[in-house]
Amino acid sequence: MLEMAAEVGDGVILNLFPRSFFPTMLEHIRIGAERGGKKLEDIEIVCRHQVVVTADLAEARNRMRTQFAPYYATPVYNNFLAWSGHADKAKVIKEGWAERDRNKTTGAMDDQLVDELACIGSVGECQDRIREYADMGITTHIISCPSPDALQTTYEAFTAENFSF
């Protein structure tokens, strides 16, 4: 899908991917762009980032688990998670969902995976992470905060007065 979007479109929109897998995704975007007679730089790469500015890492990670484990239980996201190098976790999520075992489903998303999927931490840590994504090739950033308690703090961290590249 990344290749096709880059081949026929002028951009791609990314969501809920492990950070370490981005170089592989970028390569597929490049392949599609070139197949369409374009350069990678011609493609807008948009990302919806899950960001939580907080000191309570455990609560933020748990919120990510409960909100996004069901996404990864669906066939498309489950296959994507497996493709991105997390086949073992994708399998447990799928099994947990089929067994209607919420703890098994959410438990498969350990801290390491959650930290690959989301930017969680202090203002500076989250801002640095978004800058790293920009340096990696993401051109347009959408900040999405899955934690109602952290909305104000998170969005304030990314206002024009508080953030720039």
PLM region spans:
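Active-site-adjacent structural elements that line small-molecule/cofactor binding pockets in enzymes
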Residues: M1-F165
